[in-house]
Curated annotation (Swiss-Prot):
Residue positions binding [4Fe-4S] cluster 1: C60, C63, C66, C109
Main subcellular location: membrane
Enzyme Commission no: 7.1.1.-
Protein name: NADH-quinone oxidoreductase subunit I
Entry-linked Pfam families: Fer4_7
Ranges for domain 4Fe-4S ferredoxin-type: 50-80, 90-119
Length: 180
């Protein structure tokens, strides 16, 4: 072993110990999750909820667009109809063990009934507990869009009023009068 190899080897050892010393006092990147709260981005896609309109009725009209657009098929629902002609889901089920939280269901929903919240703590011990029914998903408030009411904007007949007669609703367009 030559003197050059000995000095090089000793220098490498000293440099390694110096780097370890620097990293020992540096700020840690690991976040101690349960003790320290996690700051997620404002548009983080977490738990899916069903919202209500300003009148307190559930917004979902059981159009089945969310189930059709879901790439993993974790949403299932059955349509039913009230006496006034308003549609609602008889049952609404999301299997969160299959959900990839892509947000396509929220984008496809015409009534803004499905919304993704920043809540990500959904750990369960049994896989069956990750299947959420309508009662588990339905929240008491309107969510991100507090003033939006689908049935006021769509021009559907509700509660004995014909199309275009409800508050904040324009008269339906007569498409035959548009012809030349």
């Amino acid at each position: 072993m030559t003197l050059k190899e000995l000095v090089t080897g000793f220098g490498t050892q000293v440099r390694s110990i110096w780097m370890i010393g620097l990293h020992a006092f540096a700020k840690r990147e690991t976040q101690m999750y349960p003790e320290e709260p996690v700051n997620v981005a404002p548009r983080y896609r977490g738990r899916i909820v069903l919202t209500r309109d300003p009148d307190g009725e559930e917004r979902c009209v059981a159009c089945n667009l969310c189930a059709a657009v879901c790439p993993v098929g974790c949403i299932s629902l059955q349509k039913a109809e009230h006496e006034d002609g308003r549609w609602y889901p008889e049952f609404f089920r999301i299997n969160f063990s299959r959900c990839i939280f892509c947000g396509l269901c929220e984008e496809a929903c015409p009534t803004t009934a499905l919304q993704l919240t920043p809540d990500f703590e959904m750990g369960e011990f049994k896989r069956q507990d990750l299947v959420y029914e309508k009662d588990d998903l339905l929240i008491s408030g309107p969510g991100k869009y507090p003033e939006y009411n689908f049935y006021r904007k769509t021009g559907m007949a509700i509660n004995g009023k014909d199309k275009g007669e409800a508050d904040d609703e324009a008269k339906p367009i007569d498409v035959k009068s548009l012809l030349p």
